């Protein structure tokens, strides 16, 4: 009973995931092939890598909508470093540092100005996106071509397997474990929840609010850089638009995973399951030949239905009391 009460939403998401795969399997048997299920994750799992630290940012009462532009900037930065003759063993760590720096810029501006994080990260979204386009233009990468010619060892990395699993999926699983430990088993993770519940009280309680927020936004930036490296390896090309489509799926996964958009509550495991739920929904709809427009609409409908269902489950006692009062009034 305690497990259900503590992980009830995660169990519900897991049940929905199994049901979703089963329903799509009735229309297309390939959806039930374990190899298809495993290797199709490479098409969407990078969204999950970014969604994990984004969960912690949202739980803290913040938001970061600049990560898509950060992915594009880190992607093209990696390509420019390679073009300049910098070894990949140096270019990749530098790319991770650029991602972390983008996150720290977000945190610094939010803390210094006191402006709503949505407004700040909206501005940095255009700043990082414009910087990516500038670098792309300087390097001569135009259109969808990007910067190619990377070493075979690098381009093969994201397409290889480790212990029978695709490398991007393995990296995602490691990230889930690390962020779960950070959020649910450390003092810093506890501080994240306290800051999200009431940041003013957290400051008066001498909690390290500034340091915690800097850590969260830096981790989101670094996760964006990791996603950029994996995407460049997977596609074999560095482009400034690689993260352009990540914004809504990542936020959808975080909210669907159980995070309160106003802060104070959330779950890393819930986000991880929601990433798979949304990702396999897109994959399944593609397999049965559903147009992209309808696919996006169904994803939005799923989010609304599940969030409404969660709201009802969280406030079921209030709904029951209201129904009882209505019944007594009628009688």
Swiss-Prot record:
InterPro entries: ABC_transp_permease. The complex is composed of two ATP-binding proteins (LsrA), two transmembrane proteins (LsrC and LsrD) and a solute-binding protein (LsrB). This is Autoinducer 2 import system permease protein LsrD. It comes from the Bacteria. The chain crosses the membrane at residues 7-27, 45-65, 67-87, 90-110, 118-138, 162-182, 212-232, 240-260, 261-281, 288-308. It comes from Yersinia enterocolitica serotype O:8 / biotype 1B (strain NCTC 13174 / 8081). The keyword Ion transport does not apply. It holds the Pfam family BPD_transp_2. The lineage of its organism: Bacteria, Pseudomonadati, Pseudomonadota, Gammaproteobacteria, Enterobacterales. Belongs to the binding-protein-dependent transport system permease family. AraH/RbsC subfamily. GO terms for cellular component: plasma membrane. It is found in: Cell inner membrane. Part of the ABC transporter complex LsrABCD involved in autoinducer 2 (AI-2) import. Probably responsible for the translocation of the substrate across the membrane. GO terms for molecular function: transmembrane transporter activity. CDD domains: TM_PBP1_transp_AraH_like (cd06579). Coiled coil: none annotated. Keywords: Cell inner membrane, Cell membrane, Membrane, Transmembrane, Transmembrane helix, Transport. It is a multi-pass membrane protein. The gene is lsrD. The keyword Cytoplasm does not apply.
